[in-house]
Design a protein with these regions (language model features):
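Short catalytic micro-motifs in class I SAM-dependent methyltransferases
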Residues: 120-123
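Short, functionally important structural connectors and interaction interfaces within domains
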Residues: 1, 6, 26, 79, ...
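Short conserved AdoMet
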Residues: 51, 126, 140
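A short glycine-rich, Lys/Arg-flanked "PGG" loop and its adjoining helix->strand segment in the class I
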Residues: 129-144
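Soluble, non-transmembrane catalytic domains of enzymes that act on hydrophobic metabolites at membranes
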Residues: 10-15, 28, 77-89, 138
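Class I SAM-dependent methyltransferase SAM/SAH-binding core
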Residues: 43-115, 129-133
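Class I SAM-dependent methyltransferase Rossmann-like catalytic core
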Residues: 1-54
Length: 147
């Protein structure tokens, strides 16, 4: 991220708010209609890609919706290994594939992922062009980005 980018959003406050909200809504129950809708849209879009994704990254909380969608996918559009990154530790799984990090400073090596999905987070990024550049860098040359 460039040093001269105006800091419109307070990223530390956003992390606190996401953690608080995650604690209040650990089990969405019948209130996950928006997540399910986004998951269905995501499933349809990824299913249209005629390939299997060996490594995927979900930026922002998915509430488990991507895992549910992925278990229903045939070979095309299937994500073999899915990693999660979020500002809040409460929103990343504790299965060894979750990382607490800021979308503005991605800690991944270049060409690490076949697929990057950004849910519920890029609208709060101060340097959107910088974040998109970083996402492009962590994608493999034929990688797929969906936001």
């Amino acid at each position: 991220m460039a040093d001269n980018v105006p800091q419109i959003f307070d990223r530390k406050r956003l992390a606190r708010n996401r953690t608080r909200a995650a604690g209040l809504t650990r089990n969405f129950g019948t209130h996950d209609f928006l997540l399910r809708h986004v998951g269905n849209e995501l499933r349809d879009r990824i299913a249209g890609v005629a390939r299997k994704f060996l490594t995927g990254l979900c930026l922002g909380s998915s509430g488990g919706i991507i895992e549910a969608m992925n278990s229903e996918q045939p070979d095309e559009g299937h994500i073999v290994t899915l990693y999660h990154a979020d500002l809040s530790a409460y929103l990343v799984p504790d299965n060894g594939r979750g990382l607490v990090c800021d979308e503005e400073r991605l800690p991944f090596a270049e060409a690490s992922f076949d697929l990057v999905v950004a849910l519920w987070g890029l609208h709060h990024v101060n340097d959107l062009p910088g974040a998109l550049i970083q996402i492009r860098q962590i994608l493999k040359p034929d990688g797929f980005f969906l936001a």
